[in-house]
Structures are given as structure tokens and as C-alpha cells.
Amino acid sequence: MLDPKIIAQHYIIAALWADAPEGTRPRAPRETEEKALQLARDFLRAIGPKCQEYLKNNTEYSKHPDCRGRAEAAIGHDLWLTSQGHGTGFLDRRALHEDVREFLTGLAQRKEFTLCPEFYRGWMYLQ
């Protein structure tokens, strides 16, 4: 259904955009990519096939130019922002039904979907 690799890629992009120290341009090593991919797979498993289908078919949700029509890009972005407590993310997506926004927010805020970024010598690691 939804591609966890794209979710992981945009999860990392959102992490770098939102939380990298000002004026730096850190990169994500393979270890970070693998952790983000596992998180994306776990998140997709948690939301289930019915919710995945809803997100995939909701063209308004993936309308932002950065998403290029892919719900996975929006999910990765929203998963990072929601799980890190940025006050934005799934709840801001008016294209999603209120029940879906609340369900996804509740999941994203659970401990198993919250990875902490650590920036060290130009690299971002997820713990």
C-alpha cells in the first residue's frame, strides 16, 4: 500500500529541517535511515490497512508541493513534527477527517514512535 521508504525519507527531511542546529547542514548516515525505515514500517502496521488506504486516496492531504502527490511524504513530515511535540503535524491537516487526525496524533505521540535526534560532527543520529 504505502511505501515506508518514502515515509522514512521525509521523516528525516523534516527532522533536519525542524531540529538541526541553526546554520548547519547535517546529513543522515545509513544507521539513521535504517532506524527511520523501521519506525515507518511499525507506524504503518499500527495504523492498519484501512487507514493507509484512506491516506493514500486523500489527494488533498498530499497536495503540498513538497509531497509531489505522495501521501507518504506528508506522513513522514507529520510523524516527525507530531512525535517531537512541535505543536504541528497531523492535527493541522484539515484535509484529514478529525477522527483520523486525532488517531494519528495519538499514535505518533506514543513512546515507540518518538526517536530523539542527536547531532554530532555533521551527522544526525536517531536514538
Give each language-model segment a name:
Residues 1-71:
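Long, contiguous N-terminal structural blocks used for assembly/anchoring
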Residues 42-121:
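Amphipathic protein-protein interaction modules
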Residues 125-126:
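C-terminal edge-of-domain segments
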